Amino acid sequence: MQPFGVLDRYIGKTIFTTIMMTLFMLVSLSGIIKFVDQLKKAGQGSYDALGAGMYTLLSVPKDVQIFFPMAALLGALLGLGMLAQRSELVVMQASGFTRMQVALSVMKTAIPLVLLTMAIGEWVAPQGEQMARNYRAQAMYGGSLLSTQQGLWAKDGNNFVYIERVKGDEELGGISIYAFNENRRLQSVRYAATAKFDPEHKVWRLSQVDESDLTNPKQITGSQTVSGTWKTNLTPDKLGVVALDPDALSISGLHNYVKYLKSSGQDAGRYQLNMWSKIFQPLSVAVMMLMALSFIFGPLRSVPMGVRVVTGISFGFVFYVLDQIFGPLTLVYGIPPIIGALLPSASFFLISLWLLMRKS
């Protein structure tokens, strides 16, 4: 049996074309919305409309990764729907091409799309998002902020600050503050395990603070305190311009970060959930295409194209909601994050198989 027969290639070409067209429309719509949102920030530093456009372009890979499952569902629905409307699927079945063989052809098309999704999520999207945020920070603040996969660096007057992670809007973790004098000699190093922003007094409240005084080159003195304060121009809004969300990290980056959090005795549940969600996202692409096929052979066999689109959007939205609900629930009830990440895809896969096989 050939890996890709004539009918496999025909079905694959049709589905691939409609998926790419759908993905282009979804990413374009998202890009327009993002560009308009970035225009609100124009005027800060040298950040202008051109900068907003560049930021939007650099964010495209992340949007591609986000919208790929939805595009797979809608595109497969449209492509298979066109084949059904032209009675081509009926002719295929009449010539001995069974329903499960059609499903296999769809899955063969899904394989390169799954690999493409994995490649974008692991290498292209994280780098693009990091470049976008650094570009925006450079335009707004003149290079005083720099984001990396391991954390972010910031220049605060004569001080340099390294922040391992930004936890939420007003909480930081792993803060190292390197204080220099006007002659650029290192005066002190202060490390805090966590920091929470106090909006009333405009300061950061530090906890578990270790400080080393280097003003005397012959003797280094150290001190440890339970808490402290840090007055700085680095507000949550400014750090949010460049800080990478867990969604923007690669699988390998998340894996290393989870290991670091566990080794330091910190809760890694949120990042584990993000890691498993990224691992299983390519599976959701295949599941969405299988779901589209089950609809075409079932309830959507002879309905207008508009109904298929609405149905696809509805089920894509349901899948998204389930994905957003089950994940946090596993963290709340102490269930392994892998279950919360896998359950929506597994549920839709079983539903698709049932719809395909009930009239086979």
UniProtKB/Swiss-Prot annotation:
It comes from Escherichia coli (strain K12). Its main location: membrane. NCBIfam families: LptG_lptG (TIGR04408). It is found in: Cell inner membrane. Residues 36-63, 125-278, 336 are periplasmic. Component of the lipopolysaccharide transport and assembly complex. The LptBFG transporter is composed of two ATP-binding proteins (LptB) and two transmembrane proteins (LptF and LptG). Keywords: Cell inner membrane, Cell membrane, Membrane, Transmembrane, Transmembrane helix, Transport. This is Lipopolysaccharide export system permease protein LptG. Residues 1-14, 85-103, 300-314, 358-360 are cytoplasmic. Belongs to the LptF/LptG family. It is a multi-pass membrane protein. GO terms for cellular component: ATP-binding cassette (ABC) transporter complex; membrane; plasma membrane; transporter complex. The chain crosses the membrane at residues 15-35, 64-84, 104-124, 279-299, 315-335, 337-357. One of its GO terms (biological process) is transmembrane transport.
